[in-house]
């Protein structure tokens, strides 16, 4: 049973518009390399990067809390659109750059690895999307 379901409607594909059922999201989708001067909007890669970074940050806080560790972290999500040589189409790759600020590197890496196992986005992409984890 779902704990929460997000609902967003997209019209017009990569040159269209998206809206969420609650009205929070309501903006144009534009091709990253085809933006015209003054044109605003986002793209699916930015949206995926935002969602993954936020979700991973929550997972990192969760696994740290389970070990009674207070953590101050920042997650930078990078999502790249790449050519898929296997079928001539496209695929995405993800890099998550994790800055845990004052935490020692060994413990930070342990928590990042645990968060990667726990995070719903990581579970959804596992075996399907190349995901790199970088500790800053």
Curated annotation (Swiss-Prot):
InterPro entries: KH_dom-like_a/b (IPR015946), OHR (IPR019953), OsmC/Ohr_fam (IPR003718), OsmC/Ohrsf (IPR036102). Keywords: Stress response. The keyword NADP does not apply. It comes from the Bacteria. GO terms for biological process: response to oxidative stress. Signal peptide: none annotated. PANTHER family: ORGANIC HYDROPEROXIDE RESISTANCE PROTEIN-LIKE. Involved in organic hydroperoxide resistance. This is Organic hydroperoxide resistance protein OhrB. It comes from Bacillus subtilis (strain 168).
